[in-house]
Amino acid sequence: MERESNAAVDVTAGADTPGESPERRRAEVGDVDRSMYDFVKPESGYERFADGLSGDVVEEISRKKDEPDWMLQMRLRALETYERMEMPKNWGPAIGGLDMSTISTYVASGAKQAESWDDVPDDIKDTFERLGIPEAERTSLAGVGAQYDSEIVYHNMKDEVAKSGVVYTTVEDAMHSGYEDMIREHFGTLIPMTDHKFAALHYAVWSGGSFVYVPAGVKLDFPLQSYFRLNAAGAGQFEHTLIIVEPGADLHFIEGCSAPKYNVANLHAGAVELFVGKGARLRYSTIENWSKNMYNLNTKRVRVEEDGKVEWVSGSFGSHVSYLYPSSLLVGPRASCEFTGITFAGATQNLDTGCKVTLAAPDTRASVDTKSLSKGGGISTFRSSVVVTKKADRARASVSCSSLMLDDISRSDTIPAMDVRNATASVGHEATIGRISDDTILYLMSRGCSEQEARTMVVNGFADPVSKELPLEYAVEMNNLIKLEMEGAIG
């Protein structure tokens, strides 16, 4: 059942409490240097394909990667599918400003993939140092991949992780190092090229991304992370992430994204395919900080087997337009899904996000908890889709969406959809839409906060359930992004 309210919302949750550990004190946000994300590196000497899409472009990408014929044929079928399919109609924000004839589908620095930051070209290394990736690798990660425009420029994994049998590399490298059959078995099976027009585009020109294989019973103590940086103006990024977590294994994978702002359109149309085996667990965390000229048309999907569990943690910031609906297919008995997410739509932004869960086996469970914020005329739309099949006896699903508008010119919508075909299932939906309580702001100002500080504190409290699900350094980044979005929120 849906409940909508326009009443003022008091959302001061998240303030420090006595005895709370330092790792959980995240309400305070440090100053943000905008140059951390908006700096631009020159493309001198880079290889850049001509704008637009053609069979020659697709074949050249495949040739550069020395792909097997089956992958080339898949690309060519995808191109035909893309040309045949129409643009989305009557769905989400308008994307008429995206003209593929002005987008380059492949840009590469020419740098060889390195296993040491010392071997990465200085200009590219400086980019990732400013984003904090090498430091995060040293302190809290089991492995890191870094993509710059269309190609991975750095990839490394700790020796002890590799010795456990974990494979963490690019899809391209995996195809040439004994995993071609595994990739062919899984690649493009969860997200077919016919899913939508931009899925077809992705399969035609995909480049880069990550391949992760975790053997049965292996549990990683630290996360793996891939970071995707789109530096080139008027370009697209089309990475493909393929993760296979075998029965009884455990993995936390983190995905980070950013790009500088240009006065021309950029496009991100990646794909994420995740396979969670019997009794396995996968947490997939994402902080997306695309620039506000970006069209973010990403597709993510997971298949979860018996007693398996997937946990999505998603923070969506930036981009001009976003279509993002991670989908979970619970196909084994007692498979479960948890989705925790937040979006922040500021001026000129229209973020259409949400998630879909299909419960297709007995005793499956799904929990969705999302937060959305909008200010400065930004539009935030949350779509949820819960499907319960006839076989899903005693399935349980709950969806909760809380929206907070920070002014009178912004907009927030909640669009739930439920398809329940089993009488023993229980499905619930709750939505709240509101504004910051004036009384809350006045109280915080009476305690010494400025109005700007008070509003930022309230918003951080609102976002705290998502922040708590992230590793400390990524929670700090998310809170910094919130403060960056909050600058100028008064007046």
Predicted regions and their residues:
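Conserved beta-strand/loop scaffold segments within soluble protein domains that form the structured core
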Residues: Y154, E160-C449, A463-G491
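Short, low-to-moderate order helix/coil transition modules at the start of elongated helical scaffolds
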Residues: E2-A271, F275-R281
